[in-house]
Amino acid sequence: YNEPFHVARKMASLDHMSGGRAAWNVVTSSFKAEAYNFGREAHYDHEDRYERAHEFVEVVKGLWDSWDDDAFIRNKESGIYLDPSKKHQLNHEGKHLRVRGPLNVPRPPQGYPVIIQAGASDTGRELAAATAEVVFTSPQNIEAGVAFYNDVKGRMEKYGRARDQLKILPGLSATVAETDEEAEEKFEYLQSLIHPEVGREI
C-alpha cells in the first residue's frame, strides 16, 4: 500500500543520498489488516495485487525517467537551473493507476535503483521475471532451488529480458548449536512452538 509517486521519490532520494546504492524490495502486502489503514474495506485479491504491482513498477520506472541524466544544469552564472526540453511527462492511465508526473527529483544515479522481489507463487514468479533484478527465495532443498531458478529464468524471454539480468539469492535458515544433535533438538523445539491455527490465521 503506497503510491508510485511516493515510492519513486523516496527511492530516488535514497539513491542520491547513498551515492547510487539504493534498492527497492517490491512487496504486494499479505495481510487484510493493512487495507484498513489505507482507505480500503478489503484487501486486494491475489491476482489483482500482482497485476497492480506489475503496473506499479512500470509507473515508478517511468517516473524515474522523468528527467534526462543531464537535465539539471545548476549554473549560477547563467541563471539556468534545468533544461526543460529534457523533461519527460509520464501521463500514465492504466487499470489500477493514474499518474501524470514528472517526478520532482532528478534522475537517480543508478537510473533505476535495484528492484528486488520475493514472490514464490506463479504470479509472483511472473512479476519477478518481468521486473526484478534480484529475487529472494528459500527453497527447502537443492532440487527445489534448481527448479525455482530454471522456472523464473525461463519466463524472462517473453518480457524481452536476458537470463543474466536477474540474480536469484537463496535464503538460509540455520539452527546453530555445539553439536548436530543439539541443533536438531533445538530445531524440533522451535518447530513445536508453531501453532497451526495461528499460522493459518496469519
Q: How would you describe each model-predicted region?
A:
Residues D15-R21, A129, E157-R163:
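Acidic (Asp/Glu)-rich catalytic clusters
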Residues L14, W24, V60, I115, ...:
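Conserved, mostly hydrophobic/aromatic
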Residues G20-V26, P113-A118, E133-T137, L166-S173:
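Hydrophobic faces of well-ordered beta-strands that scaffold small-molecule active sites
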Residues E47-Q110, E143-I202:
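An alpha-helical appendage that flanks or caps ligand/catalytic pockets
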Residues V7, Q117-A130, Y189:
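Short, acidic/polar
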Residues Y1, T28-K32, W64, S121, ...:
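Active-site-proximal loop/turn and secondary-structure-junction residues that shape catalytic pockets
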Residues Y1-N37, Y44-E47, R52-F56:
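Hydrophobic or amphipathic alpha-helical targeting/insertion segments
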Residues Y1-F5, E41-H43, E47, P109-D122, ...:
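Active-site mouth loops of central-metabolism enzymes
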